[in-house]
Every structure is written in C-alpha cells, then in structure tokens.
Amino acid sequence: MKQSPALAPEERCRRAGSPKPVLRADDNNMGNGCSQKLATANLLRFLLLVLIPCICALVLLLVILLSYVGTLQKVYFKSNGSEPLVTDGEIQGSDVILTNTIYNQSTVVSTAHPDQHVPAWTTDASLPGDQSHRNTSACMNITHSQCQMLPYHATLTPLLSVVRNMEMEKFLKFFTYLHRLSCYQHIMLFGCTLAFPECIIDGDDSHGLLPCRSFCEAAKEGCESVLGMVNYSWPDFLRCSQFRNQTESSNVSRICFSPQQENGKQLLCGRGENFLCASGICIPGKLQCNGYNDCDDWSDEAHCNCSENLFHCHTGKCLNYSLVCDGYDDCGDLSDEQNCDCNPTTEHRCGDGRCIAMEWVCDGDHDCVDKSDEVNCSCHSQGLVECRNGQCIPSTFQCDGDEDCKDGSDEENCSVIQTSCQEGDQRCLYNPCLDSCGGSSLCDPNNSLNNCSQCEPITLELCMNLPYNSTSYPNYFGHRTQKEASISWESSLFPALVQTNCYKYLMFFSCTILVPKCDVNTGEHIPPCRALCEHSKERCESVLGIVGLQWPEDTDCSQFPEENSDNQTCLMPDEYVEECSPSHFKCRSGQCVLASRRCDGQADCDDDSDEENCGCKERDLWECPSNKQCLKHTVICDGFPDCPDYMDEKNCSFCQDDELECANHACVSRDLWCDGEADCSDSSDEWDCVTLSINVNSSSFLMVHRAATEHHVCADGWQEILSQLACKQMGLGEPSVTKLIQEQEKEPRWLTLHSNWESLNGTTLHELLVNGQSCESRSKISLLCTKQDCGRRPAARMNKRILGGRTSRPGRWPWQCSLQSEPSGHICGCVLIAKKWVLTVAHCFEGRENAAVWKVVLGINNLDHPSVFMQTRFVKTIILHPRYSRAVVDYDISIVELSEDISETGYVRPVCLPNPEQWLEPDTYCYITGWGHMGNKMPFKLQEGEVRIISLEHCQSYFDMKTITTRMICAGYESGTVDSCMGDSGGPLVCEKPGGRWTLFGLTSWGSVCFSKVLGPGVYSNVSYFVEWIKRQIYIQTFLLN
C-alpha cells in the first residue's frame, strides 16, 4: 500500500495487506476474550490496519468538512462583517427575510423586518436598491459538473458577487462532503440552488429563485448533527429564516424552489436521462430495471416486471426459479430464501425459514439472520481453541504473553519455543524480539538490526529535510523499519495535522519520533525535548479532539528529557528548521498544504500561491507534447512510457549502426541480440526472439529473430519436444499441429539446430539454433499452438452475487486464492493466472518481501475449514513492479511464482488475462471476490459482489487528495452498496466475456473500504495496462533466469 505526500482519507482504509481474520465464535462462548485482547499484537494489528484507519478516514473527511465550514465562514464574514446593506437609502440591520428572488432590474426585498441583513453571498452584482441597470438577457446556461442534477438549465449572471470562481468551488465542495456523508438526500441540490439560482424571465425582468425555507429546514435537520461532530452548528450564512415558503405569498406563482414542487421527481436528476433513487442519488436512466441494486435501496428495480417463468424478489429483481430456496441470498433481501422446505438431514432451517447447508452450522460464520446456526457450538467446530473455563479463543492467542482466557489457561505450559521470539531473533529494548532484517527480505547493511541500535540513513521521504540524516530503529512508535513507519497510521496523521497549522514545528516533532536521530558514536536515540512535545500536544491535541481522537499514547511527553538537562541531550528546532515536509507545498504565507494539491486547479493556500506558476517548465518538470502532462525528470527515459504517445521514452539513446537499443535505452551489439544470453541489463535483447508469422495461406511459420533479422527454422532433425518448447516460450500453451513446409524462396534465411542441441540444456529455442549452415531438407517449421484453457468454471452453479455482497458457492471462482503467512494466516487475496503464477497487489508485501514466509492456498471457500479441493503451494519468487509507489498507490501490482505447478481441477484453474487493448467501458458490471469485511467482521467464507465500472473522470471527483491514473480502474456504486473491503486487497475483479469465459481486469488496490458510502468507489489495479509487463516477467523468470 510509499509515503511521500500524506495519504488521502480514502487510502487509509486500504492498508498494506489485511490482517489475519479475528476468528468469531458464538457470542456467548467468546465472553470478553476479544475485548481483553486489545493490548495484544494480533488484535492491535487488526485495529491499526482496519478499524482505526477506517475511523481515521471518516475523521479526516470531517476535518476537511470543518476546514470548508471555516473557509465559508471566513468568506461570509469578510463580505458581511461590517458592511451594512443599503436599500433605498436606508441602512438594513442583520436578518432580513428574503422573498427568495434576486432581481437584476429591481429589488423585491421585503422590508417587513428593517433590522435584518441580507448576506452578501446571496446577492448578485447589483445591490437590491440599485435600479440603474436593466438586463433582459442575464440568464446563462449551467455548465458546472457538480450541479447537473438541477431540473433547470439557466441561472443568473453575474452569479454571487462576493464569491470568486475559486471560492465557488469551495462553496460547492462543502455540500459535496455533506452529500458523501449522506446526511440529507437533497443536500447537493440545496447547495446548487444557492450557487446557481434558477433564472426566471418575466417580461423585461429576470430574477433568480432561491430555495424555500422548508427546503433549508429539511437540509438543516438532516446535516446539523454531522456538523456537530466538528463542533459546528448549521452555518449562520445558511440560516433558514432568510428564506420564504411558497405558501407565504399568493401573488407570485413561484417564489422559491423546493424539490417537492416539481412535476415528477425525475426532473431533479436533470434532462430526463437520469433516474432519481428514493435515497436521493441520481443514476443513469439506463441502469433502471437491469437487475442490479444501483440505488442501494433497490428503488431502481422496484417497478420492473418479471416474466412468468422468473421469480420476482421483494427488491424487484427477477430470478431464475432454480435459485429459489437454494440457501444463497440471490435477491439481496433473502426473499428468495424464505418459507422454504428444508431437508432435515442435509440442511439447517433458520428462524426466517431459510435453509442453509449443514456444513455451515457451527463454522464460525453467522449465516442465519437469527444466528441460530452458531448456537451451542463447540470451540473446535469453529476453528477455535477452548479455554479451561469453556471460553473460545483463536489459536494464535495461545502462549503469546497475554492472558486471553479469563482463567489464564491460554498461557499455561508454554515452552520457550512457543514464545513470540524465535531462534535467530534479536531481543531489543523497544520490542521483545526482532529478526535480523526487521521482517524484510531486502537485507542490506542499512536494514540490518543485529545490534538493534545501528545508525542508518533516513529514507522516509516525509522526513528527509531534517537537520540530521541518520536514524535507528525501532522508533518511539515501535515501528521496526523505515518501511514500516512509512505505511503507518502516524505517518498519515501528522502530515494531515500539519495542514491545520496548529503548531509551527509539528512536522519537526513528528519526525523526531518517526525517524529518531541516531548518535553515530553510541548508536542510541537522541529524543526530542519535552517542551517540544508539550507544545505540539497543547496546540494540536484540540484539533484531534474535535473529531473524537486522542493524542497518540506513544508520544507521552514525560518520557522525553527536559531541555538543558544535565544527563541527556535532546532536540529542539532552531529558526532554520523547515516547517513543511517534502510531502507538503509551502505557501507564500508559510502555510503547509499537501504537495498533491499543488496546481490541482483549486486554491488551498490562503494566498492562492499553490495555484501560481503551474506550467511544467516553471515547476522544473518535463511536459508531454500531446496532453501537456507534467512529469518528473526521473521518469523520463526509464523504460516505462508515461506520455500517451510514448514521447518520454523516445530519443533516449544514441546507439551506433552496429548496435541496437535495449528497453532501458542501453546499447548492445546487434550480433548479441537473441543469442540466448542476456546482454541488456533488463534482458530485453532476449525478448520476442521466437514468433509465429502468418502468410496469406494462413500457415503459421516459426520465425526466430537473430541479429536484427528474421529467420526461418530449418526442419532438419526437428522433434516434438522442440515444438513444445517453442509454444511454451511464446506463451501459447501446447503444440497441436507441427508441419514441415517446403521452402519456395531461392535464398531463404535459415537457422538450423545445433548438432548437439540435446546436450546443451538450453532453456530457450533460439539458443539451440545456429546460423550459417545449409538446410538439407529445404523445409521450414509450421506450428499451431493451443492456448491453455482459462476462465472456465466447470464446478460452479450459476448466478450469484462483500459489504452488501453475498456468500459465494464453492467452485464458483476457481482462480481465487488466499495469500497467507505464518502466524498471521490470510493476509491478501490473489488470482491464479497460470499453473505456476499468481497475481496480487504490491502493497501486500510492504515490509514482507521474503518469499520464504509466504504460501498460497487455492481451492478453498471457507478459510476456517480445509476443503478436499484445497491445494497449497509455497512461494518461490515475488516480483514487485519497479514503479510501485505507496505515495500514490500507483503501479500496485506484483507477480508471485509458486514452488510447483498446481493440479488443474474444477475448483482450481486459472482466469484469463485481457489483451493490452482490452479496456472496460463505464457502466459495465463485473464481480469482485474475497474474504473481506462484511460490516464489522471478516467472514470465513468467500464473499462475492457485483460492482459497476465507473469512469476515471467520475472516480476522480471522489478523491481530492489522490490522482486516478490509467493504471487504475474504479468500480462500485454511488451509494456504496457493494465494494471490496480490507481483506480483499489483491483479490480479483473479473468480467464475463462472450462464450462464458471470465477475464481478470482488476486487482483490489485501494479506495473505499468500510465507509464506501462516504469515500466513493473502490480502486483496482488495471490489469490490461500491465499485461505486457506480466508476460515479460514470466518469460524472464522461466527462460532467462531459471
């Protein structure tokens, strides 16, 4: 799941690998075992990786909301503070009741309460008393994308007199965040009617229609409690007393706008092409009556007709009768599973009449709504360990140093070997034990923790502008490595706090505890001074308190020494300490804003300086000619194209005439190209050396690239094993037809088999061939390869549907696998793409790149109950994408090589990979699967859910602090009905293609997790973008390195 700019709220829910599921027993049997476990590493890991980040995401959304309230209040008071409104020569006080019309030509402001004041932001350029300017063509079309739901096309011009264009964006952003919190279904409509009042033309006059008071009161009632979470009430500039209701005047047909007054609620979604859900969400009209819960409340399916041979769910969905009373929730509300006749020998009857398979009883999952399937269950049946007092706990809680059984029996008879410290671990001051590389397989000298206090260079980008450059670990938060610190909650929290400007030296303080200064002489930490900690806490703790969080316990200031202490040195900032981290942009005013907000089209600095000098050259960046995209110079000529026309990878080298250019732009002699040995450092001189050439007769001739020239392969001495090698090398499966075709050309280019090719032990075909020898048969090889079958589900019973998702039938997703490590168990989902190859996301291996600690489990549906179809393979190789960056969670993909081939069965078989040019269209429906969280727990059974593909442009609107790139796919629902949760990281997003084959298009990467309704859709790594890289890496590992 990288830590340069601070992480967006939505990213914090997608941690680097999911935690081991905290096993669930019967509620009565479990007692308080789990609640007592908060101090243990297992549950603490669950809290840090799941609950806290999700809460933090919600919290930071509220912090952002708070900042927008403050911004709007500032704009309001700046414009209204001391400037009385003059109407007909009289000075008005505060709180005038508006008639809810804004006239360009004349005023219609009521003077019933002359002591009231009209907020300046609700007036247009002409003051109400100014009748000197008539404008009969003041209406203009509404083009703002956030307000397309408005049922009218025209608004007034000029718009709000005191709200500049950038402030208008902030004004609407305030309502956008309220909308995401779902406090009132029409809150966005309310904001848009304020920003763009409907333009009504009445003869020579034009006036605007403001919201009705009842509309305002409904919005206030729904959202004031949300604002209360950040210690704000309904803003004064939105007070409802200034608006009028329709019934208060009869001489004007329409004096205010209300959603109830429109003829047909569909108009609220605009222009008739959209559908208004009962929840207030607008969806494209084409999604109505398509069998999917796009509205979150099934209102888009409520009035749809089913044919006579289909079952009509209470949700409105139509089902094949074969899916009724089969134990699976196909309707989404269990209406297809009620009042069923259960087989008493094979099925359990739930209280609502649903029948579930007997093997689901006492398996640790509550499959019945009334939980009757988990009553009177033994610990063993649920995969748990029984305490002496009958309490059930997970097996990993045994002998871990914490008493989880109330009688303490889980810590009895524990030998030294059973403790968390294993042979070879180092015992350290701040952590019970550390392995020699801090959990990392990249065991370079800087990572070595053999003496647990060795100084190492600072590599955490967040803190690379400190006045010192060496640190040692573990740090004051207990992080064992800088990589672990980079993916921690604290490395996201402090940069977000810095933006609030709560304390000038907060960033310096946070870095002194994230990357403590290391004394090069003693190897010991030099801590921050107590005063620095106390000042940071005093000024910034209140900001956390606003959203219900506490100052991190690990930063207890009493542990740090006083300044000028006689017996210990400590750190205090001097006047030259940089206030903003490298992950921030420093405004001219000194304010720090996230670097990702620099030049994003929206002013975040109070002096707007983050939107100045935004040209690529002005920011010392390289500009793509085609789309003016700005790139860092470090990605130019790095072998990975970033510009749409690949211009960043052109003209990167100047090879001689007898040389060819490698993919990384190095130069290698032509004679060395495709000679069986890698001469380019990236092995690109050995890529695509064997191909098939199709002529007009559709015969596939085997071609070999040698010294920049194509050659035919002579048939002399050819054997079937060579056809197998050729097809495998090209990634085309097994050979089905091999032919020897007579050559018609007079002087063909031949490559012939080496005389003793069988003893060469070559791994590629082209290294077994030689040039310069005659072909006696004058015949060339024609080859037809049969691709390995993929994407089939022979064991699946069709038609089924993770947060809002459903339990999946065994064998339905035979490519789904579980990436596991000891002792944690399931960490991430993964996908089988070939007999020996698996895909997952790169962030699952953050700090855990050692292949020896991983295994892959396939053919399993219930994590807690081994299956007869289950296959387990150890991991041989882990290949992370070299451009993977946690700072933006981009290039989030990795390839895993298994220790041996899988045995292909109906329950274990690979999925198909897409073609590089095969991209998903918006509003396509696909499936996600995994063992992610369903509400408040991680299920044992594999879950599945349908999701709709969302355009990248629409997706970007949900993520202000992240950039959605072409390496990503967005999927989910505006309502957040179904989306992948934490444990699904690395799991598949698959779509069914014609012929019943399933193709892998995405890997669950980041985005919305537990609060998808708040944070928008899920974000997936775009497999289509990476197909060439995937195939290249498999080829290199198979033929060039092995």
UniProtKB/Swiss-Prot annotation:
CDD domains membership: CRD_corin_1 (cd07445), CRD_corin_2 (cd07888), LDLa (cd00112), Tryp_SPc (cd00190)
Topological domains annotated Cytoplasmic: 1-45
GO cellular component: actin cytoskeleton; cell surface; extracellular region; nuclear body; plasma membrane
Site residues (Cleavage), renumbered to this chain: 164-165, 427-428, 801-802
Record annotation: effect of changing residue 30 to A: Impairs cell membrane targeting
Domain Peptidase S1: 802-1035
Gene3D superfamilies: Frizzled cysteine-rich domain (1.10.2000.10), Low-density Lipoprotein Receptor (4.10.400.10), Trypsin-like serine proteases (2.40.10.10)
Residue span, FZ domain: 134-259, 450-573
Membrane topology summary: Single-pass type II membrane protein
Activity regulation, short description: Inhibited in a dose-dependent manner by non-specific trypsin-like serine protease inhibitors including benzamidine.
Record PTM text: N-glycosylated; required for processing and activation.
All ranges on the Extracellular side of the membrane: 67-1042
Keywords on record: Autocatalytic cleavage, Cardiomyopathy, Cell membrane, Disulfide bond, Glycoprotein, Hydrolase, Membrane, Protease, Repeat, Secreted, Serine protease, Signal-anchor, Transmembrane, Transmembrane helix, Zymogen
InterPro entries xrefs: Corin, Corin_CRD_1, Corin_CRD_2, Frizzled_dom, Frizzled_dom_sf, LDL_receptor-like_sf, LDLR_class-A_CS, LDrepeatLR_classA_rpt
Disulfide pairings: 139-199, 147-192, 183-223, 212-256, 216-240, 269-282, 277-295, 289-304, 306-318, 313-331, 325-340, 342-355, 350-368, 362-377, 379-392, 387-405, 399-414, 455-518, 463-511, 502-540, 529-570, 533-557, 580-592, 587-605, 599-614, 616-630, 624-643, 637-652, 655-667, 662-680, 674-689, 790-912, 828-844, 926-991, 955-970, 981-1010
Entry's localization field: Cell membrane
Entry's transmembrane regions: 46-66
Disease / disorder: Pre-eclampsia/eclampsia 5: A hypertensive disorder of pregnancy characterized by new hypertension (blood pressure 140/90 or greater) presenting after 20 weeks' gestation with clinically relevant proteinuria. It impacts 2 individuals, the mother and her child, both of whom can be severely affected. Preeclampsia is one of the causes of maternal mortality and morbidity worldwide.
Purpose of the protein: Serine-type endopeptidase involved in atrial natriuretic peptide (NPPA) and brain natriuretic peptide (NPPB) processing. Converts through proteolytic cleavage the non-functional propeptides NPPA and NPPB into their active hormones, ANP and BNP(1-32) respectively, thereby regulating blood pressure in the heart and promoting natriuresis, diuresis and vasodilation. Proteolytic cleavage of pro-NPPA also plays a role in female pregnancy by promoting trophoblast invasion and spiral artery remodeling in uterus. Also acts as a regulator of sodium reabsorption in kidney.
Domain notes: The DDNN motif is required for targeting to the cell membrane and enzyme activation.
Miscellaneous section: Initially named CORIN due to its abundant expression in the heart.
Protein name, UniProt field: Atrial natriuretic peptide-converting enzyme
Organism name: Homo sapiens (Human)
